[in-house]
Swiss-Prot record:
PANTHER family: HISTIDINE--TRNA LIGASE, MITOCHONDRIAL-RELATED, HISTIDYL-TRNA SYNTHETASE. It is an enzyme of class 6 (ligase). CDD domains: HisRS-like_core, HisRS_anticodon. One of its GO terms (molecular function) is ATP binding. GO terms for biological process: histidyl-tRNA aminoacylation. The keyword Ligase applies. The keyword Cytoplasm applies. Belongs to the class-II aminoacyl-tRNA synthetase family. It comes from the Bacteria. It catalyses: tRNA(His) + L-histidine + ATP = L-histidyl-tRNA(His) + AMP + diphosphate + H(+). It comes from Chlorobium phaeobacteroides (strain DSM 266 / SMG 266 / 2430). InterPro entries: aa-tRNA-synth_II, aa-tRNA-synth_II/BPL/LPL, Anticodon-bd, Anticodon-bd_dom_sf, His-tRNA-ligase, HisRS-like_core, HisRS/HisZ, HisRS_anticodon. The gene is hisS. GO terms for cellular component: cytoplasm. This is Histidine--tRNA ligase.
Length: 429
């Protein structure tokens, strides 16, 4: 065993597991294309103030969970990204993309970092996939990102998910509610935990997001934001619900749902999985019209988005048995050299097959035919192509189907044609 171990809160992903990641990623890519979203990639680190301005200084993420550092004593603080939305919006504003096209639909699959206590489904380095729809203020926009997210989960075959939605209104609604909430919480001030006391003045809505069991009785008794909403905000929320109903997307309304980021407005949503225990959120998102202005834009930019935790998706799928038939794909052909002296010819044949788009493996260690065949079976190769002295002279090679045991001798050109036909039949089945 190596004296060096993986850093706590990070993990290695080996080939037998990476096939599961690719499966989920392929579904995300395919559906993103169907919905008209293009991929964006941003740096893994940003200036720290980007997240302080966007996520909010009273959030747990900014207050406790960011990996920040100074690249040099006179430099600005830099942070490994704890979430994607702020970086995506920064990139769009910096590139001035909204001046060239008023609507942008972007998606990502990215690595993120938070200083959390490692546990199942919650690591210090973790992955998310998500989407951002920028430039559309219609309730149809947030309904689309919810639909996109739920269709990913449906396509993956995940069962038993619960979608909760709420409306946070606009800035005036929340300002009005903050005063009502402070008035309610004031008599309980001495019972608030330290984090909630810090939030009491700055942003009491964050108190509603507390997971402290000792705080739940106080939170349950709090007035809801719903009672402070304007007619326009309620009407906006009703339209979102209409779009979800028309698509038969089931949901529950949860007036306590505020999400963990300060930039949300109007509709917010969260999806939970019964397979994940206490940390049951598998995805979520909402609308964030004011984020662009917080980051220096001259005005608001209507925007909606979602993010889902890749590790939590994989845990849920594993527990529901959705990977039972999923295995790493082996090579289509294993080229077997009957003696080490024929390795050069075997490599030439393998090169020819690969040039034709046929996945091919060849033994480089000069092992016996028996060892090579064991290797071919271990790799789940579909065919073995044998290279012997007679084959080199005649140009006719023995090709064995390792599933049916059928064997034929053909020229390399005919073998390539047969293998390509086999590939087409495989894809059509």
């Amino acid at each position: 065993m190596s004296q060096y171990q993986v850093v706590k809160g990070a993990r290695d992903i080996f080939p037998d597991e990476i096939v599961r990641w690719h499966y989920v990623e392929d579904v995300v890519h395919r559906l993103a294309s169907l919905y008209g979203y293009s991929e964006i990639r941003t740096p893994v680190f940003e200036y720290t103030e980007l997240f302080q301005r966007s996520i909010g200084t009273t959030t747990d993420i900014v207050g406790k969970e960011m990996f920040s550092f100074l690249p040099d004593p006179q430099g600005r603080s830099i942070t490994l990204r704890p979430e994607m939305t702020a970086g995506v919006m920064r990139a769009v504003l910096q590139k001035n993309l909204l001046s060239t096209a008023p609507i942008h639909k972007l998606f990502y699959l990215s690595e993120l970092f938070r200083k959390e206590r490692p546990q199942a489904g919650r690591q210090r380095q973790f992955s998310q996939f998500g989407a951002e729809l920028l430039g559309v203020s219609s309730p149809a926009a947030v309904a689309e990102v919810i639909t996109f997210m739920m269709q990913v989960f449906e396509t993956l075959g995940i069962r038993g998910l619960k979608l909760r939605i709420n409306t946070l209104g606009d800035s005036s609604d929340r300002a009005r509610y903050r005063e009502i909430l402070r008035a309610y919480l004031a008599p309980f001030y001495d019972r608030l935990d330290l984090a909630s006391r810090e939030r009491f003045e700055k942003n009491p809505l964050r108190i509603l997001d507390s997971k402290n069991p000792d705080m739940q009785e106080i939170i349950e008794g709090a007035p809801t934001l719903h009672d402070s909403l304007s007619h326009e905000a309620l009407e906006d929320f009703e339209k979102v619900r209409f779009y979800l109903d028309s698509r038969s997307i089931a949901y529950d309304i949860d007036y306590r749902l505020v999400r963990g980021l300060d930039y949300y407005c109007h509709t917010a949503f969260e999806v939970t999985s019964p397979e994940l225990g206490a940390q049951d959120a598998i995805g979520g998102g909402g609308r964030y019209d004011g984020l662009a202005k917080e980051l220096g834009s001259s005005g608001d930019v209507p925007a909606s988005g979602f993010a889902a935790g890749m590790e939590r998706v994989l845990i849920t799928m594993e527990k529901q048995g959705l990977f039972a038939a999923l295995r790493p794909s082996g090579p289509k052909v294993y080229v077997v050299a009957q003696q080490h002296a024929l390795l050069d010819h075997a490599l030439q044949v393998a090169y020819r097959l690969r040039r034709e788009g046929i996945s091919t493996e060849v033994d480089l260690a000069g092992r016996s035919m028996k060892a090579q065949m064991r290797d071919a079976n271990r790799m789940r190769a579909c065919f073995a192509l044998f290279i012997g002295e007679d084959e080199v002279v005649s140009g006719s090679y023995a090709l064995k189907n390792l599933v049916t045991a059928d064997q034929t001798a053909q020229s390399i050109e005919t073998i390539i044609e047969m293998l390509n036909q086999y590939s087409g039949a495989e894809q059509g089945s």
